[in-house]
A protein has these predicted regions:
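A helix-coil-helix interface module used to build multimeric assemblies
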Residues: 1-202, 207-211, 275
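Acidic, glycine-rich loop-and-beta core segments that form the ion-binding/anion-interacting portion
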Residues: 216-276
Length: 276
């Protein structure tokens, strides 16, 4: 498949430059979000009369077929494509002909990848949040089951004051509650739809940005098109929140290791969760 931008150049691109620019080996993880976003875009194009409703239906059905085939393993990624967007469009055009080329109307890969990233990270936040809630519930259950159990409290691994085991456990519950708050705040700021920003300054097509935002579960649209496609602060914010979460989990894990050691003997771990 020719490059989307091939019409702007006349010479051959170096294979070294091609390999350097290729991102499909890692952005293939975005396939589900890329296809879901494209289905919403096709629906919007049809609703706005930019393409016919019949063409929109063909595009949506074709995209669903690609998603199904990727999920089942019937279709494999072509790592010769530059990125996940070009791979999906290539397969769609092979299956539908010229109708497949209309999918990219009123859209750029700039706002497309910004959309994919936000959708992917929102999904990741939802998964992480569910797991943290499971850990939190387990900690609270252990605290409830061990009310009244007294243990030494340590500073610098020196016994300092007697404390309740449940009180020590609930310290981690408090940390995880703050972690959940950070994840939720991050998701809220991330939940802004950039689609329609195009390369950086929108499009002359009569698009409906809110149509796509609603269809994809976003709370709002990006109010500035340059900000919508160019900034990745939401990625850094999530990395910060997850780093703090992992620090808390690492700290808790180290406590469990100490408590289960021969020197402490405060707890016993099931053989199901230990190795030699």
């Amino acid at each position: 498949m020719s490059k989307l931008w091939a019409g702007r150049t006349s010479g051959e691109v170096s294979s070294i430059a091609d390999d350097f620019n290729s991102s499909i080996r890692f952005d293939c993880k975005l396939y589900k979000q890329d296809i879901t976003g494209s289905m919403a875009h096709a629906a919007m194009l049809g609703a706005q009369g930019i393409i016919s409703q019949a063409e929109a239906g063909q595009l949506i059905d074709g995209l669903q077929g690609i998603l199904n085939d990727l999920e089942s393993g019937a279709l494999e990624f072509d790592f010769g494509c530059e990125d996940i967007h070009m791979f999906v469009e290539q397969v769609l055009t092979q299956r539908l002909g010229d109708v497949g080329k209309k999918l990219h109307t009123a859209r750029s890969r700039n706002d497309q990848v910004a959309l994919d990233l936000r959708m992917y990270l929102k999904d990741q936040i939802d998964e992480i949040t569910a797991l943290v809630k499971d850990v939190l519930s387990a900690i609270v259950a252990q605290a409830e089951a061990n009310k009244g159990v007294i243990m030494p409290g340590y500073t610098h691994l020196q016994r300092a004051q007697p404390i309740l085991f449940s009180h020590h456990l609930m310290a981690y519950a408090m940390m995880l509650l703050r972690d959940l708050g950070r994840l939720g705040d991050c998701r809220k700021r991330m939940n802004v739809c950039p689609i329609g920003s195009c390369a950086l300054a929108g499009t002359t097509y009569p698009t409906d940005r809110r149509f796509e935002a609603r269809k994809l579960g976003f709370d709002d649209i990006a109010r500035n098109s340059i900000d919508g496609v160019s900034d990745r602060d939401f990625c850094v914010e999530l990395m910060s929140a997850v780093s703090i979460l992992m620090m808390h989990l690492s700290r808790f894990s180290e406590e469990i290791i100490l408590w289960a050691s021969w020197e402490f003997k405060f707890i016993e771990l099931s053989d199901a969760y230990t190795t030699g």
